[in-house]
């Protein structure tokens, strides 16, 4: 499995709604609210044959209330 993170900027007043919809979709392993330019941080795992860009475009960015995303692809985990 390949891990990656997505920072999510929500429409005003929609962060809890987006977080709940993301949790209900059961596609993220972890979802956090954050301070700063983005409202949420979600961790995902996909199989090595899955295109991360298509996954984010099809499964994450289509959730109502999301205004913008930033995908962070990781290389090596030093601790878990």
Question: Predicted segments — roles?
Answer:
Residues 1-80:
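A compositional/biophysical signature of low hydrophobicity enriched in polar/charged and small residues
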